[in-house]
From Swiss-Prot:
Note: During catalysis, the active site Cys acts as a nucleophile attacking the alpha-carbonyl group of tRNA-bound glutamate with the formation of a thioester intermediate between enzyme and glutamate, and the concomitant release of tRNA(Glu). The thioester intermediate is finally reduced by direct hydride transfer from NADPH, to form the product GSA.
Family to which the UniProt record says this protein belongs: Belongs to the glutamyl-tRNA reductase family.
Protein name: Glutamyl-tRNA reductase
Protein species of origin: Methanocorpusculum labreanum (strain ATCC 43576 / DSM 4855 / Z)
Record's keyword terms, sorted: NADP, Oxidoreductase, Porphyrin biosynthesis
Sites where the protein binds NADP(+): 179-184
Site feature (Important for activity) residues: 89
Enzyme class, UniProt record, top EC level: oxidoreductase
Superkingdom per UniProt: Archaea
Disulfide bridge map: none
């Protein structure tokens, strides 16, 4: 098979399509700093993307290197793609065709944040950068050319649809949203469209809860009032970014004792929906009388309905993804050839300095002006001599003629005389 990429690229992926919520949690890296420190010793570029439905690792390196690294970290079961397949995967990811909720826009923001995270750890090189940025641009373009995201639901709004499905309707209900971040905002905005009695918002930062509550005309509650607020609610949707549990079974059981109407034999039913990753709600809560607990895995019914409704647009997006791949490969090879030519100029500069110093040592009485002239002359000659070769390397790479690009570079560096003519 002809090699079309000038350097190695690989992606490890684990997502909702293959693994349930609990198993997917085993693929995550709790200590991001440690992950980047270890990975950066192996790969020139590495990006980590973790969402509630997927874990993705993009590296400037080979599939074997990535697999060996993950096995060393006791992470088994990732699907690993390399070369063109890795680029195609990134395009599909950005287009929203691999999302649990087909066409959702949140993946684009998540990919941007993954880049920023890599940059903050100094692990984003020119190759990983061009991969993510090109994929994101194509994802935006595909949404503009199709209706794949028109009226599409997010994970947050899917949780609201699930609540509506399970409760019959949400008219006159009290809803508590736990978490005021991006996902909590999506949930709260989706709830605004319903005929609710009240929306409560609680968050670790009370100021953030107040801002969100003002936007949706709800009521902000301090986190220390969580359980009293649960006692008032019919549905609780939890979506914080906390690394620990927020709602515990024993405290919830005590709260349920406050949910009896006079003469009732059982507490009023409480629906809990946990869309956080890691989980916010203790799984033992499902054993508390009167409580139903739903998680990300339960959103699949909403996802399947969404996919059926967007089948035609998804097919259109797939066509556009395939059409975008050749230009993606050109952009990739352009970036990779930049690295190649940079190495070429570095090699040439070392030779220039060495030979210049030899010449100056023979001119024992050379004054600073003469030294400056010789330095300028050798520098200009080096750049002129390499200019055409560098252009040829870049042109060959962009045309996916990686073999010619590599032959040119090796021929120059090894001192071989090589003349490669292209037919017009």
């Amino acid at each position: 098979m002809t090699r079309t990429l000038l350097t190695d690229i690989a992606v490890a992926t684990a997502d909702h399509s293959k693994y349930g919520e609990e198993v997917l949690g085993l693929f995550r890296f709790k200590d991001e700093t440690a992950f980047f420190e270890k990975a950066s010793k192996i790969f020139p570029g590495v990006v980590l993307l973790e969402t509630c439905n997927r874990v993705e690792i993009l590296v400037h390196g080979s599939a074997k290197q990535l697999r060996d690294f993950l096995h060393g970290e006791q992470r088994f079961g990732f699907d690993i793609l390399e070369g063109e397949a890795a680029l195609m995967h990134l395009l599909e990811l950005a287009a929203g065709t691999k999302s649990m909720i087909i066409g959702e826009d949140q993946i684009l923001g998540q990919m941007r944040r993954a880049l920023l995270l890599a940059e903050s750890h100094d692990t984003n090189d020119v190759i990983t950068d061009v991969c993510l940025n090109t994929a994101i641009r194509e994802g935006v373009s595909i949404r503009q050319k199709t209706s794949i995201n028109k009226g599409a639901v997010s994970i947050g709004s899917a949780a609201v649809l699930l609540a509506e499905e399970l409760m019959g309707d949400l008219d006159g209900k009290n809803i508590l949203v736990v978490g005021g971040g991006e996902m909590g905002t999506l949930v709260a905005r989706a709830l605004c469209e319903k005929n609710l009695r009240a929306i409560y918002v609680t968050n670790r930062s009370f100021d953030r809860a107040v801002l969100l509550a003002e936007e949706i005309k709800g009521r902000a509650m301090r986190l220390d009032q969580l359980y009293p607020c649960i006692a008032l609610s019919d549905v609780v949707i939890s979506c914080t970014g906390a690394p620990h549990l927020i709602i515990h079974a024993d405290e919830l059981a005590e709260t349920m004792n406050e949910r009896f109407w006079p003469l009732d034999l059982e507490p009023r039913h409480l629906l809990l929906i946990d869309i956080a990753q890691p989980r916010d709600i203790d799984d033992a809560c499902r054993d508390v009388p009167g409580v139903s607990l739903k998680t990300l895995d339960d959103l699949k019914s909403i996802s399947e309905k969404n996919l059926a409704a967007r089948k035609t647009e998804c097919e259109h997006a797939d066509v556009l993804v395939k059409a975008a791949l050749p230009e993606f490969i050109k952009a990739f090879n352009r970036a990779a050839s930049g690295d190649l030519t940079k190495n070429l100029y570095t090699w040439a500069e070392e030779i220039r300095q060495r030979e210049k110093n030899k010449a100056l040592s023979r001119l024992r009485d050379a004054d600073p002006y003469l030294e400056s002239v010789i330095d300028d002359l050798t520098s200009a000659l080096t750049k002129k001599l390499l200019e055409d070769a560098a252009k040829s390397i870049r042109a060959s790479a962009e045309c996916t003629d990686t073999q010619t690009a590599e032959i040119l570079l090796k021929a120059i560096i090894s001192g071989e005389v090589s003349c490669i003519r292209r037919s017009e």
